[in-house]
């Protein structure tokens, strides 16, 4: 059965649906076309839930009617099978209603800018940053998403001090938003001769991609600098000043890009990252103000929170937010993140239901 608070929401919607339908029926379209158009739009939005709820009630009635057939010995076996089928349909319809009535994250349909940075652990942390980059790339391939490296700061052994990528596709943020936080790796580094297990950390930030419709940037607030691009070890790899650094003066947020050969391409990439960073900055600022007003602390998967551990010797991945442990480390690193992400999505839905 649907939770009481959801039934109350549906009853309100049913009442609005009936009222809107009544207003439309009594309205003269020739005299008030604008009102007719507005009411028609409202009715269309309400009708989806109205039809779902009508289907839900029909299944409930069918279940009650089928239960009556259980009293007939000749029809009992057939009725039991039909009840099983109807209960499955009822659960599916409940999920549809709950999903449509649950508040959505406005960013869920957006593409993302994903940033991976080596934390504690030196070269080993940088090497695991490369492993995580590959993991997200494989996951994107499984989903049919477009994956593009925007900026990378490589180390001599093939790791990354920092790497920033864009991932584009259907509902990317709704899947990857849970990856923001500290990822911990426990393994014997290739640089370790004594065979001792080391613990290193990597931070991941997942930002919904933004543009000028999400964030207004005053050109006067930007300081744009150019310099010669350099490779691993600091040697210059370009004789022209193609690298670009853009600083947003009011917030102090600074973005550098040097992977492209032309200054224009690097500038476009830097602005793309800056828009996402500023959107994230202002949203967090707004949330902090709201939390302060409510006098409460809410965990949101911030970068300072340890969210997941990858233990190589035990072939184990543990997500600490939901106490989920999987013994298929290599599969996860090969992009098999569905079990983890679907569990996190279920937890988010559960929390939304509790607070609805």
Swiss-Prot record:
Keyword Cell division annotated: no
Functional note: Peptide chain release factor 1 directs the termination of translation in response to the peptide chain termination codons UAG and UAA.
Alphabetized UniProt keyword annotations: Cytoplasm, Methylation, Protein biosynthesis
UniProt KW ATP-binding keyword: no
Domain of life: Bacteria
Post-translational modifications: Methylated by PrmC. Methylation increases the termination efficiency of RF1.
Compartments (UniProt record): Cytoplasm
GO cellular component, one term: cytoplasm
Protein name in the entry: Peptide chain release factor 1
Main location: cytoplasm
């Amino acid at each position: 059965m649907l939770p009481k608070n959801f039934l109350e929401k549906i009853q309100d919607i049913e009442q609005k649906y009936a009222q809107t339908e009544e207003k439309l029926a009594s309205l003269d379209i020739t005299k008030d076309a604008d009102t007719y158009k507005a009411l028609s739009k409202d009715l269309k939005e309400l009708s989806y839930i109205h039809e779902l709820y009508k289907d839900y009630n029909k299944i409930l009635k069918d279940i009650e009617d089928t239960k009556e057939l259980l009293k007939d010995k000749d029809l009992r076996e057939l009725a039991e099978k039909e009840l099983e089928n109807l209960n499955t349909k009822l659960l599916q319809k409940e999920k549809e209603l709950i999903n449509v009535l649950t508040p959505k994250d406005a960013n869920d349909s957006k593409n993302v800018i994903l940033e991976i940075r080596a934390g504690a652990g030196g070269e080993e942390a940088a090497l695991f940053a490369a492993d995580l980059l590959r993991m997200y790339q494989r996951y994107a391939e499984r989903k049919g998403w477009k994956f593009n490296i925007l900026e990378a700061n490589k180390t001599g052994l093939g790791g990354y001090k920092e790497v920033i990528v864009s991932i584009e596709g259907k509902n990317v943020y709704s899947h990857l938003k849970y990856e923001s936080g500290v990822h911990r790796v426990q393994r014997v580094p290739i640089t370790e001769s004594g065979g001792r297990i080391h613990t290193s950390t990597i931070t991941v930030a997942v930002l919904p991609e933004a543009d000028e419709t999400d964030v207004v940037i005053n050109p006067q607030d930007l300081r744009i600098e150019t310099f010669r691009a350099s490779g691993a070890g600091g040697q210059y790899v370009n004789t022209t000043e193609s690298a670009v650094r853009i600083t947003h003066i009011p917030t102090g947020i600074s973005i550098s890009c040097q992977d492209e050969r032309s200054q224009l391409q690097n500038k476009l990439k830097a602005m793309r990252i800056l828009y996402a960073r500023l959107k994230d900055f202002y949203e967090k600022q707004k949330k902090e103000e709201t939390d302060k007003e409510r006098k409460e602390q809410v965990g949101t998967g911030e970068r300072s929170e340890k969210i997941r551990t990858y233990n190589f010797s035990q072939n184990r991945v543990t997500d600490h937010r939901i106490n989920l442990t999987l013994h298929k480390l290599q599969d996860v690193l090969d992009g098999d993140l569905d079990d983890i992400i679907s569990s996190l999505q279920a937890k988010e839905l559960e929390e939304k239901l509790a607070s609805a």
